[in-house]
Amino acid sequence: MTSCGQQSLNVLAVLFSLLFSAVLSAHFRVCEPYTDHKGRYHFGFHCPRLSDNKTFILCCHHNNTVFKYCCNETEFQAVMQANLTASSEGYMHNNYTALLGVWIYGFFVLMLLVLDLLYYSAMNYDICKVYLARWGIQGRWMKQDPRRWGNPARAPRPGQRAPQPQPPPGPLPQAPQAVHTLRGDAHSPPLMTFQSSSA
């Protein structure tokens, strides 16, 4: 594997581990959407909210008759009857299908960004080459090879003679060709005028 490929894998591994740890640490901090005892739907939110104290980082709720709210660790352990220090699996949010959907969606968004970058760099090759050279990223892969892009007028390889053009075999039938001149309007038909009414 090349050093560039190994470096890319290392970066992806670090990003994956950071995202995975963030997901595991955030499951207590999310108040998921819920319906109260009157049947009204309440949207979910992330703790702490902008209006909350920064120590209120956990989601508390007593039952369906009381709204969910952000609370501190002591209140969370009293209300939810969960010991955060004893088990890391205590009050884990279990919406695995939504979490899987977020990961799949994130993967496709990342792939779209990579493809967009590759398309942009292919369309703006000269600009990208200048910036990469300015940043110190250069190499043989940056030089355009006319053979790579399917140039019909290929340059001869070293040690080869240039191919000589050959005349066409025999006379070719001549098709009648129309001759157009721009000198005058002698041969062009007159323009027709149409009456138009404005409505």
From Swiss-Prot:
The keyword Signal applies. Residues 26-97 are extracellular. Its main location: membrane. One of its GO terms (cellular component) is membrane. The chain crosses the membrane at residues 98-118. Residues 164-174 have a biased composition (Pro residues). Residues 1-25 form the signal peptide. Glycans are attached at N53, N95. Residues 119-199 are cytoplasmic. It is a single-pass type I membrane protein. The keyword Membrane applies. Residues 152-163 have a biased composition (Low complexity). Residues 146-199 are annotated as: Disordered. It is found in: Membrane. Keywords: Glycoprotein, Membrane, Signal, Transmembrane, Transmembrane helix. Belongs to the shisa family. PANTHER family: PROTEIN SHISA-LIKE-1 (PTHR31395:SF11), SHISA (PTHR31395). This is Protein shisa-like-1. It comes from Homo sapiens. The gene is SHISAL1.
